[in-house]
A protein has these predicted regions:
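Metal-dependent phosphoester/phosphodiester hydrolase catalytic core
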Residues: 25-438, 448-452, 460-498
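Periplasmic/luminal catalytic loop of GT-C fold multi-pass membrane glycosyltransferases
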Residues: 441-442
């Protein structure tokens, strides 16, 4: 694929849509106009604001305050970066010393920007109930995504979805924006590597890939500019396409998770400094902080939850997208040998259940699933640590439907069921919608509690109190509740090792 981006950046006034078969969003007249805005929890009292512009900024800045009409504080950085095939520069600024659980208003400094707002993070140990959404495997909507008119690309896997359907999951997130406090998205954003599924793109894959990325993050911005959007990698971030052992044919900017790193690498957190009074917890948290490698593996604390985001694609033995992985995508490694697993164990060992009783781990590829094949190398790497440190809930995607499993370990359901099990509860929330369609639920293992693939869907996780967690699945198009479950955990051990 021959790159045309050197000339595109030199001549930004050209009609962008002429560069590729897939349609680029138009370039604004003011090249400092912020687009593709996104925020993230960055620390106990801080958030990161990320956005893209069509020219590099010498000093990205954000004005902010607790009144929409009085943005009295300003934070700036020197962080404005790009990569070889991108038309845009990615900017990031961190807002620090925020009051907890407070509405802040902010304006990205530009002659063409508007005021938006967010809720600052809850402090670790705050036992106020709150909800989050799990949105995974979400792709672009429109002529270059799953709503292609008169094109039955992989439509055999969508038995009931009209191809002209609007992006119902993003619409539902917008309509319920006051009902959740942040989003976790462990992998598969945009599906830019599926440009190859659409014949019109075949002669200009480089531009098609970039155009789909720009479209998707513009579509997501009304959500991600207001709610912290916490992302980790999936297989569709790896390269310009998924044909095994051909990633060397991708342009340099479209290999090895380049856009994902460029977009999220400076906004995701590492690990929070422990607020536990226990010295061992502090030591483990400090160790995990040194080993964290955002946006691939990291953790954060929010109210009564400790959330760990892991990388199921690279950086462990036989990782599917690694240099010797089964997918042939030659991704990573992004850390030293065993760094991710050393981080994971240190981080889990640091969790003080008196402060953050709920321990949630999110990754892309599941090892328990219907309608697809579980990731055996992932299970070998991670499941033992899930059980040892008493992870309460595992959140995954990759298989394009919604699933819930009773607590299970090593393929055997926990006899305690949903009342104080030792084994983790697992969900798959991969039905948000993308060009590849939905996966049939197939044969269901005996520990399956719920499986749904008739329409696009997503999960809401509700932290009710220190001992009760609720997981709800919703149909995106209607908002109808599809499944609801409640997990009880006594959390009577401050540091759990079993």
């Amino acid at each position: 694929m021959v790159s045309v981006f050197a000339s595109a950046k030199a001549l930004p006034v050209l009609a962008a849509s002429a560069l590729a078969a897939a349609s680029y969003p138009p370039i604004p007249a003011d090249l400092t106009t912020p687009v593709q805005q996104r925020i993230a929890v960055n620390g106990p009292n801080s958030v990161s604001i990320g956005w893209n512009t069509y020219q590099q900024l010498s000093q990205p800045c954000v004005a902010y305050g607790t009144s929409a009409t009085s943005l009295t504080q300003q934070a700036c950085s020197q962080s404005s970066v790009t990569y070889q095939t991108s038309r845009t520069w990615s900017n990031a600024v961190t807002l620090s010393n925020l009051s907890p659980a407070t509405t802040y208003y902010y304006k990205i400094v530009s002659t063409n920007s508007s005021v938006d707002h967010f809720l600052s993070p809850r402090l670790a140990g705050d036992k106020t109930p709150f909800s989050i959404n799990a949105i995974i495997d979400l792709g672009v909507v429109g002529p270059d995504g799953y709503t292609i008119q008169n094109d039955q690309t992989k439509r055999d896997t969508i038995p009931t979805i009209d191809p002209s359907l609007n992006h119902t999951t993003i619409q539902r997130l917008a309509e319920t924006v006051n009902d959740y406090e942040f989003v976790i998205h462990p992998g598969d954003l945009a599906y830019a590597d599926d440009w190859i599924e659409t014949p019109k793109n075949i002669f200009d894959g480089t531009n098609a890939y970039q155009a789909i990325l720009e479209q998707f993050y513009a579509q997501l911005a009304p959500i991600s500019s207001r709610k912290a959007y916490m992302a980790s990698p999936g297989n569709h971030e790896a390269a310009c396409q998924e044909i095994p052992h051909t990633t060397g044919l991708c342009d340099a900017g479209q290999r090895n998770f380049s856009d994902f790193v460029n977009r999220f690498g400076r906004t995701m957190p590492t690990v929070f400094t422990s607020t536990s009074a226990n010295n061992t917890a502090k030591v483990n948290a400090n160790k995990a902080q040194q080993l964290a490698n955002p946006p691939f593996w990291f953790s954060f604390e929010y109210g009564m939850a400790h959330v760990v985001m892991i990388d199921t694609e690279t950086d462990f033995a036989d990782a599917p997208d690694g240099p010797d992985g089964s997918e042939g995508l030659n991704g990573g490694p992004f850390g030293a040998p065993d760094q991710q697993l050393q981080f994971f164990e240190a981080d889990l060992a640091s969790v003080d259940r008196a402060v953050t009783p709920w321990l949630i781990v999110a990754g892309h590829r599941p090892w328990y699933t219907t309608g697809g094949t579980g990731c055996a190398p992932c299970q070998a790497a991670f499941e033992g640590l899930f059980y040892k440190y008493g992870v309460d809930l595992g959140v995954f995607g990759h298989v394009h439907n919604s699933q819930r499993f009773f607590p299970v370990y090593n393929g055997t359901a926990d006899a305690a069921g949903m009342t104080d099990p030792k084994a983790p509860m697992y969900i798959v929330a991969g039905g948000a919608g993308n060009i590849e369609g939905l996966s049939d639920v197939g044969s269901k293992p005996s520990y399956t509690a719920f499986a749904y693939a008739n329409d696009f869907s997503y999960a809401t996780i509700r932290f009710l109190d220190e001992q009760n967690l609720q997981v709800d699945f919703y149909q995106s198009s209607t908002g109808n509740l599809l499944d609801s479950s409640k997990l009880f955990k006594s959390h009577d051990q401050q540091f759990l090792v079993q």
